[in-house]
């Protein structure tokens, strides 16, 4: 990766993780899917920080948190046209499930869109008890964007979902409102002719 003209190699990374590609080696093929974290001294957010990967492809920051920048590959129009409906369908099911008290139809609809052997599938399965309390929260999404569609292989793609939401939480003695702004990095894989969500990482500070 090259940031403001300074070339950084994997040896310069302070940490590396597979993130949303954990356990998906069967689908990513030989692609390098590591998320690398670098620490750079004397780098300021103004003027704008620019970066390209070592193949010369420009990457763009989609989230900032304190002194951290999170970069993703820019979207590919062909991939976006093919995969947007997949991402929208999954995230719509996720929003529908997470904004209500536990209800089996919403629960099974969401699980049907997730790779069964993934950590994401296990996470949703374990969420049942917590979701009984979701009826006390009203969620209104004021901004919802699907961006940075990038094909990893013939069987895997990644994108980001950026959103703002007005939340109103209620319990038996009070009501309070707050605004939530976040982004998710999502990975999807193709299995038996169907695209399924396989990874979902929150990106704070979007």
Where are the language model's segments positioned?
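Short, charge-rich amphipathic segments
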Residues: 20-23, 27, 60-63, 110-119
């Amino acid at each position: 990766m090259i940031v403001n003209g300074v070339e950084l190699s994997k040896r310069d990374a302070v940490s590396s993780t597979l993130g949303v590609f954990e356990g998906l080696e069967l689908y990513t093929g030989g692609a390098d899917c590591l998320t690398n974290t670098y620490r750079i001294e004397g780098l300021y957010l103004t003027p704008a920080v620019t970066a390209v990967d070592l193949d010369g492809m420009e990457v763009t920051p989609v989230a900032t948190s304190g002194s951290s920048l999170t970069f993703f590959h820019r979207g590919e129009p062909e991939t976006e046209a093919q995969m947007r409906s997949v991402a929208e369908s999954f995230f719509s099911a996720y929003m529908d499930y997470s904004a209500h008290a536990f209800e089996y139809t919403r629960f099974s609809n969401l699980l049907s869109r997730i790779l069964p052997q993934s950590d994401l599938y296990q996470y949703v399965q374990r969420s049942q008890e917590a979701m009984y309390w979701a009826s006390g929260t009203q969620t209104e999404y004021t901004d919802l964007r699907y961006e940075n569609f990038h094909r990893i292989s013939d069987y895997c793609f990644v994108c980001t979902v950026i959103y703002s939401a007005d939340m109103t939480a209620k319990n038996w003695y009070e009501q309070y409102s707050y605004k939530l702004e976040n982004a998710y990095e999502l990975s999807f894989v193709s299995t038996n002719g169907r695209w399924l969500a396989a990874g979902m990482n929150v990106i704070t500070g979007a």
